[in-house]
């Protein structure tokens, strides 16, 4: 009887520990807030909301997958470095192997407001600009991740 009670106590302890390893919505929101702060001061601030939402989810999923126990992530001394590494990985992935998704980082409307693209540019002209930009970026950076780090 004593062994059964001890066994039940151990099982209850293990189950309670495994349940506490999952991230709560509050913990996810804390990481999202950090990502939003990062977005405000980085080159990805021009991403459209839907694309940024996908990037945010990728980063959160990457970190949560690497650190299923939020407390271990929260206690990291290099927590910001971990976040930056996940960000670089996800942005590099979202740019694409041929830098075909540069418009996600640099939307044409933002480039027109900044005076980089003329306001009346046609779709063909905008596509030609992105093709040229992708070519120049490929000349300077071998991989999308290298380009992302440079941003």
Regions found by a protein language model. Name each.
Residues 2-7:
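Sec-dependent signal peptide recognition
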Residues 14-16:
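C-terminal motif of bacterial Sec signal peptides marking the signal peptidase cleavage site
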């Amino acid at each position: 009887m004593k062994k059964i009670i001890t066994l039940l106590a151990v099982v209850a302890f293990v189950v309670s520990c495994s349940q506490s390893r999952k991230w709560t919505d509050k913990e996810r929101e804390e990481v999202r807030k950090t990502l939003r702060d990062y977005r405000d001061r980085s080159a990805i601030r021009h991403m459209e909301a839907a694309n940024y939402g996908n990037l945010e989810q990728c980063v959160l999923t990457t970190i949560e997958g690497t650190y299923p126990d939020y407390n271990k992530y929260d206690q990291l001394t290099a927590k910001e470095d971990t976040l930056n590494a996940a960000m670089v990985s996800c942005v590099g992935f979202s740019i694409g192997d041929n830098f075909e998704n540069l418009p996600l980082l640099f939307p044409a409307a933002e480039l027109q407001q900044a005076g980089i693209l003329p306001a009346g540019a046609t779709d063909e002209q905008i596509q030609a600009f992105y093709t040229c930009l992708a070519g120049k970026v490929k000349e300077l950076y071998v991989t999308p991740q290298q380009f992302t780090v440079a941003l």
